């Protein structure tokens, strides 16, 4: 499928990208990302051209995917003709398609537990985060707090019954625990809502008006349990060991056994969507689980000689973006999409290292990506495609199912992508 991209006479430098980037391919989906909006743009409820109403959060980009016709002979699409006759479109913030988690929560996941008691107080922690994040990251962190009530969370605790308030969050203690240290908190990976849909907890007697609201306290406890379980699962993945329900209950859940299903489910979702790790049951009798990379990928990006984090989650996102963009995406568009999640070319990320080197060198050497010059461009512009190893280990259908699952939808909700995936499977047979 030929890739179409409107450059609008601009160079290929990210600094020259227009506010709205369009890219269409013949009869398939195009992606429009609007990144710079004024505050007034988000004050009222907007209606998508062919979709439901959504209340847009302030200062967040939005994504509109629609059918358009493009000129196959060059990279300048013809005047678009939008299809309105029953064609379902994807209209929503890109952060609702791909997973996002707050830096403060990631710090809790990757920080050695034995250092937590020495960690700074909440007020000091926020100040330290802002210093580490820098101006851009601190602004994003502040925006995250404002957006928390709007976006559906990767760790959405949902509606719960009353939680026991006697126990405070107690992280698992292990003298042999492996540490995961971030290189820098200079990027923000989206937003995670601390708010569930509201628990119906009965408020007990209070001896002080300054005590924390029981409902918020219960939600915080549950949230802490989820994060601690993610930490435990990451350690088990690194040593390629099995984990049992009994171990999770004894190390993390403790007095909250009644809420194990919710905690385990949300921790598993976080592992899959953020780190690209699936938690699979191998023995229903003993409730034993194994942790494996998602989508049959044999790569996780963890180096034997360093305390790095799994990178297969980001790889799946990159493969998904390429697929959604018509199987080929200009480099500057890729970085614009990833920047929405706090991943910037040339800026060290506390989970993924230096992203540009990761995409243009490491994953090219691993044959997951093809990074090539766009023919006839001067100055040279580059684009990304799936590499042979990506085609061999996974498929468009599996990536589409991943995207649909992250968005809470069925793969058939994306007709053109679904047809493309089916066509690939048919050719494979």
UniProtKB/Swiss-Prot annotation:
Q: Which InterPro entries match?
A: MAGE, MAGE_N, MAGE_WH1, MAGE_WH2, MHD_dom
Does the record bear Kinase in its keywords? no
Give the record's GO biological process terms.
negative regulation of transcription by RNA polymerase II
Alphabetized SMART domains for the sequence: MAGE, MAGE_N
Task: Tell me which PROSITE patterns the record gives.
Answer: MAGE
Recorded superkingdom = Eukaryota
> Could you identify this protein by its name?
Melanoma-associated antigen 11
């Amino acid at each position: 499928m030929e890739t179409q991209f409107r450059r609008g006479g601009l160079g290929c430098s990210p600094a020259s990208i227009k506010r709205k980037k369009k890219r269409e391919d013949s009869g398939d989906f195009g992606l429009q990302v609007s990144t710079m909006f004024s505050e007034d743009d988000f004050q009222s409820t907007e209606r998508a051209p062919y979709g439901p109403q959504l209340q847009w959060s302030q200062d967040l980009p939005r994504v509109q995917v629609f059918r358009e016709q493009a000129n196959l002979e060059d990279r300048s699409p013809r005047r678009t003709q939008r299809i309105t006759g029953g064609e379902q479109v994807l209209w929503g913030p890109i952060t609702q398609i791909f997973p996002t988690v707050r830096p403060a929560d990631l710090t809790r996941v990757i920080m050695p537990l034995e250092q937590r008691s020495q960690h700074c107080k909440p007020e000091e922690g926020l100040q330290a985060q802002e210093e580490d994040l820098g101006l851009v990251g601190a602004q994003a962190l502040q925006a995250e707090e404002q957006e928390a009530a709007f976006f559906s969370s990767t760790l959405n605790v949902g509606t719960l019954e009353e939680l026991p308030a006697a126990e405070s969050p107690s992280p698992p203690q292990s003298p042999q625990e492996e540490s995961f240290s971030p290189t820098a908190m200079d990027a923000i990976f989206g937003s995670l809502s601390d708010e569930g849909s509201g628990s119906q907890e009965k408020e007990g007697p209070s001896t002080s008006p300054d005590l924390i609201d029981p409902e918020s306290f219960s939600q915080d406890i549950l949230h802490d349990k989820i994060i601690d379980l993610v930490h435990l699962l990451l350690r088990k993945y690194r040593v390629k060991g099995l984990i049992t329900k009994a171990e999770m209950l004894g190390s993390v859940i403790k007095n909250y056994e009644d809420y194990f299903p919710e905690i385990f489910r949300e921790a598993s979702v976080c592992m899959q969507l953020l780190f690209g790790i699936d938690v699979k049951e191998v023995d229903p009798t003993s409730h034993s689980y194994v942790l494996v990379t998602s989508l049959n990928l044999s790569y996780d990006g963890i180096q034997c000689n360093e305390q790095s984090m799994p990178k297969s989650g980001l790889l799946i996102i990159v493969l998904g973006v390429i697929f959604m963009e018509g199987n080929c995406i200009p480099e500057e568009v890729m970085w614009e999409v990833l920047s929405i999640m706090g991943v910037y070319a040339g800026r060290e990320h506390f989970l993924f290292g230096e992203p540009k080197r990761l995409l243009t060198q490491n994953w090219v050497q691993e044959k997951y990506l093809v990074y090539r010059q766009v023919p006839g461009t001067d100055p040279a512009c580059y684009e990304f495609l799936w590499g042979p190893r990506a085609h061999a280990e996974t498929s468009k259908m599996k990536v589409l199912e991943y995207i649909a699952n992250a968005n809470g939808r069925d793969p058939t909700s994306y007709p053109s992508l679904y047809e493309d995936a089916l066509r690939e499977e048919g050719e494979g047979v």
